[in-house]
Amino acid sequence: MQEKLNKQDSNTETTTEKTEDTSAESEVVSEAVTDAAPSENEPASDGANILVAYFSRADENYNVGTIDKGNTQIVAEYIASEVGADSFHIETVTPYPAGYDECCDVAKQEQADKARPEIQGGVENMEQYDIVFLGYPIWWGDMPMAVYTFMDSYDFSDKVVIPFNTHEGSGESGTYSAITSYLPDAQVLDGMAIQGKTAQEFSSDTQQAVRDWLDGLGF
């Protein structure tokens, strides 16, 4: 869905990506987006309890074919390993179709309906986490609706939230500012956008991009 979920609609100026995103090969492996972040990025990670929560879809994806592990999950696992975090995979109770086009259609309808799909399980003792990394692919120019379900499910007051996403050409598509607005009582730091194809096929580049980004955040 990242292509349909990531295409630029020339008539509406809305990024319409279908389900994990589209872009030409680029020398830029990752980009830190700072517009939605505060001027100081000091998460004070020493001794902090950290969670990496992410939505990611395997099966048929744009630009990478049928995959066993979603692009965003790959990045999430690198982050969790680097910072010593717990992980939570945001999964819907009703699975998305395995086929790319079919999944795109479902995702587009959910977005039109402003749906909040029910998600499986939950984070135990969410209140214990000081820092939450929040990851997702770009679907139709936005976060998957299940990510909104996740944000609605917990109190993020006084937590540090650090977004990251995968895409195939649309970057972060304004989602970091959206998170800042959606979670006004959280401190949202600089995010990282990385191409899904890079995450799938260039592991060393992806790991280095994650390390560089985390270094810049003070981890």
Protein language model features and the residues they cover:
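Solvent-exposed loop/turn segments at secondary-structure junctions
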Residues: 57-60, 92-97, 138-142, 167-172, ...
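Hydrophobic/aromatic beta-strand patches that form the interior of the parallel beta-sheet core
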Residues: 51-53, 88, 133, 162-164, ...
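Noncatalytic linker/hinge segments flanking ATPase motor cores
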Residues: 89-95, 129-131, 172-182, 201-211
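Glycine-rich phosphate/pyrophosphate-binding loop and the adjoining helix
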Residues: 187, 191-219
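N-terminal beta1-alpha1-beta2 submodule of the flavodoxin-like/Rossmannoid cofactor-binding fold
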Residues: 2-7, 13-129, 141, 211, ...
